[in-house]
């Protein structure tokens, strides 16, 4: 591509509404332009990157044996009513009617459509397993679109859906897709982690997310220093460490006027928050008569409750809800001053986090306003109904696989795979005939990659103060050739044209910057755009038989012979 025939839409200033670095650089590098809130036009520079991501994803999906389809963005609302998600999905689902007053939705995902396809086209177990995928536009009516294409309303996804006769067959395809995703993100040049994840609103049994590690990520990822273990913090198990020591202190109550938070209480008492417990009084599962019990959750003072873990306890109501003031009054409890003493005797279930369960001589609420208890010990002073993993892991915790300790970094979710089971096939009646001639409900998996989000995530991981530093596989151009003063020097232009043709013939994606611009402008644009290799051709270099080469990550340029240059580019 000749730069004189290409749209350079670079900006020198950062737009005020661009918060994260990827949004800033995508605008400045001329990759995207905002059309409306959460809607972006992809310019030629951005489209080139997008198509390269698209190509790698498509190659690996085809390699996995999946078959490409293409489904409508517009979907009949009746399918979503069948699945039960028409109301459940909430305001992110854009609903509208056509001129005939038929209700439709703009698809945020395609489980319903693909299941409808499968129930009409798949008739026998002999057709299973099968895996369909598409690369298609989605629309989610985000209440606050932000971060550019990272959280936009319209975006491109690769979504795949597999259909199986057995759970074992689903597991096999799930493992294939796990490996396929790992190959995709490796080829994209990203530092990523596959992590155990919650299944969320889509539902199902097993789930893994693929996260690109970046400081701007919205999710906390816990991973081992010595193994491949990685999990979303909401899913990472907090391992029990140590044993409870014997009591050494007497139990007593102390006045703590107006000291309600753990930090305030511990500072007032000159105590370590690690030697305190805090209570969270929540609603339990209602009994047959509709009575809702109170459940007391106790954690170490310096730890945070993991709501997802708490909701998985069979005695805790989901979604998690705090006990009402009326419920607290019925047991004579005061918010902010609740301790475990006497709760079991009052009929309250006391669930204690693992780390809190091994404390002795700790600080707790006194179950009286403006008082706390010190020297509290389990069994002697307070009873435990059950010990349960309730907290978020923290950096330095032992890895659950027994290898190393946990590090915690921010991650950007770019892929997600689920074992859906029969959630959608059951709801939409997707059945095939088995070996015995009887119909059975198929089991499903689904596998998504945010194609547009991958582009932004790659930038969040690869940039400096000059601009983007693309991994070569997805750079808009791999090589930029800059002939110095080409409009005045036919010799440099001729040499540049010859090298341009030679590198293109070798399969490189090359930009010949033949614009009538100052060298400084060209260099700034090329660094901003993140092109991995820059070759400058000048009169002095031609006289010496060398080319000036600079890799995008290099601090300094170097003069190379043509043979050295070609060897460098071939690596």
UniProtKB/Swiss-Prot annotation:
- What family is this? Belongs to the class-II aminoacyl-tRNA synthetase family. ProS type 1 subfamily.
Annotated GO molecular function terms are: aminoacyl-tRNA deacylase activity; ATP binding; proline-tRNA ligase activity
**Primary location class:** cytoplasm
Query: GO CC: one term?
Result: cytosol
The Enzyme Commission number assigned here is 6.1.1.15
Q: What is the lineage of its organism?
A: Bacteria, Pseudomonadati, Pseudomonadota, Gammaproteobacteria, Moraxellales
Q: What class of enzyme is it?
A: ligase
Cited function: Catalyzes the attachment of proline to tRNA(Pro) in a two-step reaction: proline is first activated by ATP to form Pro-AMP and then transferred to the acceptor end of tRNA(Pro). As ProRS can inadvertently accommodate and process non-cognate amino acids such as alanine and cysteine, to avoid such errors it has two additional distinct editing activities against alanine. One activity is designated as 'pretransfer' editing and involves the tRNA(Pro)-independent hydrolysis of activated Ala-AMP.
Subunit architecture: Homodimer.
Originating organism? Acinetobacter baumannii (strain ATCC 17978 / DSM 105126 / CIP 53.77 / LMG 1025 / NCDC KC755 / 5377)
Top-level taxon of origin: Bacteria
Say if the entry is tagged with keyword Ligase.
yes
Please name the GO terms of the biological process aspect recorded for this protein, alphabetically: prolyl-tRNA aminoacylation
Compartment(s) where it occurs, according to its Swiss-Prot or TrEMBL record: Cytoplasm
Q: Which reaction does it catalyse?
A: tRNA(Pro) + L-proline + ATP = L-prolyl-tRNA(Pro) + AMP + diphosphate
What are the protein's UniProt keywords?
Aminoacyl-tRNA synthetase, ATP-binding, Cytoplasm, Ligase, Nucleotide-binding, Protein biosynthesis
UniProt feature coiled coil, ranges: none
- Report the domain remarks: Consists of three domains: the N-terminal catalytic domain, the editing domain and the C-terminal anticodon-binding domain.
Which protein, by its recorded name, is this?
A: Proline--tRNA ligase
| Cited SUPFAM superfamilies | Class II aaRS ABD-related (SSF52954), Class II aaRS and biotin synthetases (SSF55681), YbaK/ProRS associated domain (SSF55826)
